[in-house]
Amino acid sequence: MDLHMFVPDFQAMREELTRLGFEELRTAEEVQEKLPTAKGVTLLAINSMCGCAGGIARPAAALALRQVKPDHLMTVFAGQDKEATAAARALFPQYPPSSPSFAVLKDGQAVAMIPRSQIEGSDPQTVAQRIVEAVQAARG
């Protein structure tokens, strides 16, 4: 029996976001160097191995980006790049850890979070609208 058929294709999950223009932050150092210093509005996707919610979040990001263009698109992968994910989450301790999720930052400060609880059980269009509204609110 080929057990590889049960292993999620993490690279494909990563590429769903990088193809959209998200920059992968794979280490804590990359996160600390880029996220806090990013000027303007940043959409941070906290990617996830979770098939159900992750399968909603990534298409939602694609739909949202048809309507809004944050200044920066960045992503970390929870469960894969653990140190990078922990470093990102340390920048917004007011929000409990959640993956998949989206954080909207303005000038390096978190101003909104779309946690897993607002992704799971929703359709990609609804989640995309939440992303659009959060980015627009950050723009002022």
Curated annotation (Swiss-Prot):
Single GO BP term: cell redox homeostasis
Endpoints of the signal sequence: none
Cross-referenced Gene3D superfamilies: Glutaredoxin
Disulfide bond residue pairs: none
Top-rank taxon: Bacteria
InterPro entries: BrxB/BrxA
Family to which this protein belongs: Belongs to the bacilliredoxin family.
Protein name as catalogued: Bacilliredoxin STH2395
